[in-house]
């Protein structure tokens, strides 16, 4: 999970890419100030708009740190004050983005006779500022403040309810937040001209993507995954996953995590580091450019959990840290979408982190750091165990084959909630029925069911589809990368992640928010959003592991 800053919660959205051609960003002008021939008025307007955006980003980055503190260091009694602090910051943020002067500056700039002299990056900045302004001016300030305050309260109650396994403790606050988010979604639906309120929320995280389009893509994905799962389950060759239950102390897991971070180039140890790893109930990433923080959760008898959550969140972190420094504080300096964000985290976690090549390098280090606790494990048995395909109850611990089914279930529930086909009161029952139907597992309590994720407590409705879309993007990215780096697996086996990381920087991170996701994936892969490369990757990998 990338914990969205207020900048994204308040919808600095990604817009129509027709303003931008398909020239790679490193071949464009990287200065987004003013062109030499820009008139004084046009230049002045553009600079003022960027200054206002910088102020907004700076304020919202402070809010994101308060969110981080709330889930990592804040004492339990601090929640009431923290909710007031965040509510006040959201009020200031809303006032800043809805400042009438922004409207006047945009109108003057967009109608200026020399507007066409601006380069594509400048036009994209203006487009995104305008889109955000138009949408935010329609949201009442008091509604924005209420949502922010309720989010803080709901997250706090969620933690306590999850610990006691009682949804009834969580339900009242969740209902309050859902009603507020639905109210906002209904307003945004009209502004964005989406088909449904839920589509308006999906658009925040995956611009120009509708629930109807997602449903079609997810059907193809589900059909392919269901077939593969059956092949894995019926294979006579099955791994021994009990080897992953060796007790490893939290202190040792922390050391392992730092070494993993070092491998992917996420610095959490030097005096010039721009990251850190902390412990929370639910892993997340937050921050901006040079201060990007990740969290994980340590289980003494499930050490692999923190390994892969750190790889996952680390993938998010290196995306944020490697966005163009020249674009910092500008709308184009944001990530493309949450789907692309998840493509980076899933790529690092699974395509790299669960590969045999990576573990041929890292496994000896793991055994050494655990003081021979894992001495009875072999590389082959370990790699097989961490890639075991088995339907499970917990999303963040699911294998990469069944994982997307967890997302499809959540997507269906969210869509039905906003369509009023189900209610918050019915969520636990429908959740349990869905898990039994699609994954064949029984949920014994709500902590392992409807309350396992932080997203709904955080008001992040519409985010879940990004995970499965990220998987699909990662498959297309892999296919493209293999054309450029045929020996990437050999490099990983030698402990060298540099060329893979540089490929991701050049082909994903460098583009920032210059394009919509549907256009960016086509620029990178030459194809529209396509499930086949991801399914091909999975089938090739697991047919080798399970020998079918």
Kindly give the residue locations of the regions a language model identified.
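Active-site recognition of the HExxH zinc-binding catalytic motif
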Residues: 305-324, 342-346
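C-terminal, non-catalytic "cap/extension" segments appended to globular domains
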Residues: 40-45, 61-64, 77, 81, ...
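Post-HExxH zinc-binding segment in Zn-dependent metallohydrolases
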Residues: 334-374
């Amino acid at each position: 999970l990338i914990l969205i800053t207020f900048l994204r919660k308040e919808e600095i959205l990604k817009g129509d890419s027709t303003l931008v051609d398909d020239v790679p960003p490193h071949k464009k002008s990287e200065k987004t100030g003013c062109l030499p021939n820009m008139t004084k008025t046009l230049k002045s307007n553009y600079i003022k708009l960027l200054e206002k955006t910088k102020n907004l980003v700076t304020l919202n980055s402070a809010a994101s740190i308060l969110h981080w503190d709330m889930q990592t260091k804040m004492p339990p009694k601090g929640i009431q004050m923290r909710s007031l602090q965040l509510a006040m910051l959201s009020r200031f943020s809303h006032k800043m983005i809805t400042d009438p002067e922004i409207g006047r500056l945009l109108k003057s700039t967009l109608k200026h006779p020399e507007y066409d002299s601006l380069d594509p990056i400048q036009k994209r900045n203006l487009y995104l500022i305008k889109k955000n302004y138009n949408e935010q001016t329609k949201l009442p300030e008091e509604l924005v403040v209420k949502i922010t305050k309720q989010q803080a309260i709901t997250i706090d109650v969620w933690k306590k309810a999850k610990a006691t396994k009682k949804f009834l403790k969580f339900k009242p606050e969740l209902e309050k937040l859902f009603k507020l988010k639905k109210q906002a979604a209904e307003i945004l639906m009209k502004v964005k001209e989406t088909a449904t309120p839920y589509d308006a929320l999906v658009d925040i995280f995956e611009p120009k993507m509708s629930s109807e389009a997602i449903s079609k893509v997810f059907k193809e994905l589900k059909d392919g995954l269901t077939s593969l799962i059956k092949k894995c389950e019926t294979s006579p060759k099955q791994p021994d996953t009990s080897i992953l239950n060796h007790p490893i102390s939290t202190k040792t897991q922390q050391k392992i995590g730092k070494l993993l971070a070092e491998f992917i180039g996420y610095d959490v140890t030097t005096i010039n580091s721009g990251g850190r790893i902390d412990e929370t109930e639910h892993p997340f990433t937050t921050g901006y450019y040079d201060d990007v923080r990740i969290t994980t959760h340590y289980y003494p008898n499930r050490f692999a959990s923190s390994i892969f959550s750190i790889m996952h969140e680390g993938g998010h972190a290196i995306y944020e840290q490697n966005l163009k420094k020249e674009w910092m504080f500008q709308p184009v300096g944001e990530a493309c979408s949450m789907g692309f964000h998840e493509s980076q985290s899933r790529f690092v976690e699974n395509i790299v982190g669960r590969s045999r090549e990576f573990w041929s390098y890292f496994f000896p280090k793991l055994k050494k750091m655990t003081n021979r606790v894992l001495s009875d494990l072999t590389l082959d048995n370990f790699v097989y165990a961490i890639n075991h395909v088995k339907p499970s109850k917990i999303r963040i611990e699911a294998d990469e084959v069944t994982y997307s089914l967890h997302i499809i279930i959540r997507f269906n529930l969210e869509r039905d909630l906003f369509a009023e086909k189900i209610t918050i009161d019915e969520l636990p029952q429908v959740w349990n029925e869905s898990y039994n139907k699609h994954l064949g597992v029984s949920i014994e309590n709500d902590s392992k069911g409807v309350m396992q994720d932080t997203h709904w407590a955080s008001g992040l409705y519409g985010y879940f589809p990004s995970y499965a879309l990220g998987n699909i993007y990662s498959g297309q990215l892999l296919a493209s990368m293999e054309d450029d780096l045929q020996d990437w697996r050999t490099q990983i086996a030698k402990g060298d992640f540099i060329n893979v990381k540089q490929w991701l920087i050049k082909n994903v991170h460098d583009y920032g928010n210059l394009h919509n996701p549907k256009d960016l994936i086509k620029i990178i892969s030459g194809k529209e959003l396509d499930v086949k490369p991801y399914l091909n990757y999975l089938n090739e990998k697991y047919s080798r592991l399970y020998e079918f």
